[in-house]
């Protein structure tokens, strides 16, 4: 089936020029159930999605916080240009590496992309491993004030100098009730909580914001989570990281440094980039290469563990074991289930 001639990657707004409540118009446009395809890094989501899209007459929306950036190609295992020409993809290569892109931007742009796809009687297929972005799509954008970059930079310097545990102790003094609900190692939530206190003058626990995951109400979704045995996934990740280095990941990091990736605190801290930025900053010592490579692999494996934990919160993502199955067979299983129950 030939993909329609549509410039999917041209969607570049940050949400200010789309409808204020996109879910309301979403319900009017709904004709088919939206497919959610998740899985840990290295589980084969991309290959499965490319097989699945023609089976269901679908178009693909990337659920990846780093694939939005032009030039971050090797380290994000970005789908090839040839594949994007065959099957329309959204939310890939839409930002310069210095631009900030957050969950609110994702919510509006992903919603706009799905509206576009549904309006042409196609099936949106959301594909990725970012549990937070899936949560945002299903539950709406995060509540609370927008991020304060200057304050976050201040906290980053504090952590670098004093450590995260002291920052957590600070939160415990300012908002002990909320601090008890998170771990002392959850840097993102600690920083966000202190940021909210700084911006609003109120404790997080005093705000009437919902922090729980919600099921989508205004449109139907059906989700799958690709599952592989841990030892197999570990072997795949080791091979994947080595191949990225063989494909000149370090050269890509050099180019991104020239383009100003340091100005973007999210992009510069992404796995696969932060390790090699530090390596380059140290003068690229040959004796440190193996240690940095092993750290790159270890950080990826730790992230996979977090991905598994996140998606366990969502029963709507049906676990789909993939051991011994080809991407095409997995896609056929999803398509069959989709047409039976979607």
Curated annotation (Swiss-Prot):
The alphabetized list of GO BP terms reads:
tRNA modification
Do you know which InterPro entries this protein is assigned to? Dimethylallyltransferase, IPT, P-loop_NTPase
Record the organism. Answer: Chlamydia felis (strain Fe/C-56) (Chlamydophila felis)
GO MF, one example:
tRNA dimethylallyltransferase activity
UniProt similarity note: Belongs to the IPP transferase family.
- Annotated ATP binding lies at 39-46
UniProt cross-references to SUPFAM superfamilies, sorted A to Z: P-loop containing nucleoside triphosphate hydrolases (SSF52540)
Protein's recorded name: tRNA dimethylallyltransferase
List the EC numbers from the record: 2.5.1.75
Q: Which reaction does it catalyse?
A: adenosine(37) in tRNA + dimethylallyl diphosphate = N(6)-dimethylallyladenosine(37) in tRNA + diphosphate
This chain's function reads: Catalyzes the transfer of a dimethylallyl group onto the adenine at position 37 in tRNAs that read codons beginning with uridine, leading to the formation of N6-(dimethylallyl)adenosine (i(6)A).
